[in-house]
């Protein structure tokens, strides 16, 4: 990094390459969005790009979309994202803008994508953040260095051990249920098991995701330091993880899509056979983390865009098979909360739930595309991440890690 001051200066310079678009007068909609609303959305994007004096991205992009819907019949987040991703590309004929494209030329430029949505809000919102993917990788490298001191501390290792203990405790509870029921009583056992299940699921599903340093190493960063453990080795470790869904290579030949979908279904069955004792039923809300490495023989014309991978191949099987929900509020028993703690129940308001039709889904999905490796197969690896700590996606985590590191550096500099 040469120096901490230099690293911070370069980070601030990269931040100026980012584009932020915020629209609060258009309801997020799927492809059924009226033509006039589509024009209105593109006009808003064009206006903000003009104000920012920004042109169309021509290279690889990291993209983040946050949505808020108000409609009682709001579509699922991935169908909204599909519509918006298309609208961020080719300019519609009625929209005034000097270029043929708006934010980017083709959504296959997107190498990292994050989509989140909250339904049942008071006001609609569409928030879009974009930056050159190369700048994102530089941020990732800085964040990985910032995380190193945290993840090498004794407190961090103690926290990891404590999290793992919840899983062991839950396994012990179900293996020795008769003894525990005798000592705790039926109601006492049920209440304790439910509490431990929540913490155990949270621990297991948190650990299934890749950390910032590992993500950094999988991209071959830092480039100028030999670690003795190449990026393909880190990818192999992720591919071998039993707490992730390993669904093989993306289809790149005619007729192979159905085979890939069957592979996804088979892997879900195998995963549930290993973990249903812990995750069925799911009592925590989850997000999806998808790591994709294409086969080096993939023709450019058939390279799958990241949203297509999640929308067409993963969500249709994962959501119904695991019973995932789009909002953590669906995991709360408000009747039980009213009985046990009426004050907290009251603080949620008279009608705390999102519209019923929006229940199925995930709280967020993010996908990262690794570069192909000559002589190595492609793969798709998926983690169901516990989304209960308000930590956000990896893009948020990168900025938060750098912010914490910079704050610590400031204190050291002053004192």
Stretch-by-stretch model annotation:
Residues 1-415:
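Acidic, proline/glycine-enriched N-terminal capping motif
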């Amino acid at each position: 990094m040469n120096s901490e001051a230099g690293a911070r200066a370069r980070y601030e310079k990269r931040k100026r390459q980012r584009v932020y678009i915020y629209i609060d007068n258009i309801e997020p909609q799927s492809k059924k969005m009226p033509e006039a609303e589509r024009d209105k959305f593109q006009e808003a994007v064009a206006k903000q790009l003009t104000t920012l004096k920004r042109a169309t991205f021509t290279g690889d992009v990291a993209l983040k979309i946050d949505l808020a819907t108000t409609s009682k019949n709001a579509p699922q987040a991935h169908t909204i994202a599909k519509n918006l991703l298309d609208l961020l590309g080719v300019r519609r004929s009625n929209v005034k803008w000097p270029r043929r494209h708006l934010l980017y030329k083709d959504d296959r430029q997107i190498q990292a994508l994050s989509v989140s949505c909250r339904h049942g809000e008071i006001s609609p919102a569409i928030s879009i953040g974009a930056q050159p993917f190369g700048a994102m990788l530089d941020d990732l490298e800085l964040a990985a260095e910032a995380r190193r001191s945290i993840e090498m501390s004794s407190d961090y290792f103690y926290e990891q051990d404590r999290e793992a203990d919840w899983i062991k405790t839950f396994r012990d509870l179900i293996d020795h249920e008769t003894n525990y029921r005798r000592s705790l009583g039926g109601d006492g056992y049920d209440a304790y098991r439910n509490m431990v299940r929540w913490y155990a699921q949270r621990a297991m599903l948190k650990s299934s995701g890749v950390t910032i340093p590992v993500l950094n190493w999988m991209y071959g960063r830092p480039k100028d330091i030999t670690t003795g453990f190449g990026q393909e080795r880190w990818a192999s470790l992720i591919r071998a993880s039993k707490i992730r869904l390993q669904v093989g290579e993306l289809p790149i030949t005619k007729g192979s899509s159905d085979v890939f979908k069957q592979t996804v279904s088979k892997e879900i069955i195998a995963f549930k056979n290993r973990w249903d004792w812990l995750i069925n039923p799911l009592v925590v809300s989850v997000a999806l983390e998808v790591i994709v490495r294409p086969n080096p023989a993939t023709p450019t014309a058939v390279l799958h865009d990241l949203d297509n991978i999640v929308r067409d191949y993963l969500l249709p099987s994962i959501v119904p098979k695991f019973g995932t929900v789009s909002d953590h509020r669906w995991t709360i028993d408000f009747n039980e909360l009213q009985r046990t703690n009426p004050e907290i129940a009251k603080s949620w308001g008279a009608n705390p739930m999102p519209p019923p039709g929006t229940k199925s889904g995930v709280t967020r999905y993010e996908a990262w595309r690794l570069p192909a490796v000559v002589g190595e197969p492609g793969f798709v690896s998926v983690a169901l991440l516990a989304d209960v700590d308000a930590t956000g996606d990896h893009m948020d985590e990168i900025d938060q890690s750098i912010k914490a590191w910079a704050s610590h550096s400031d204190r050291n500099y002053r004192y």
